[in-house]
């Protein structure tokens, strides 16, 4: 969906655009934050932000209104190398870089995995603020408590959508624990 890898089968659209035919247009309109920290660890916080702004032909100043709340928390560390940041600070930097070009849709792949409880809570507060600014946010998460903060949940297994509903509807449909079982044979 982020068009970083182009699909070789099936069909998908983002904002009504085909993920294969329209991938350049989609890339300009989506932000993506991978599950594993993937920014340049040898660059400083400021250098990472400047780099991503340049890639998207924008500037921090131009879209500061979007990242202000997040950036204000990492600005004291702007001269620190990204690899030396704490887990929570790395996530804030990655989110700022994903937002630097003012995307309409934000894809977050397990954004709080391996982050402490306080940072997780802060991160979800930031997402609520971004949602209030009109950004559509898609989050993959293994944490049901995080999923319940979303407007809608999709259960996906092996690339197939099993169910889509509100958190309340999903819990009503699956009142018992869900388990994923796989075997090697």
Regions found by a protein language model. Give the residues of each.
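ABC ATPase "signature
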Residues: 164-165
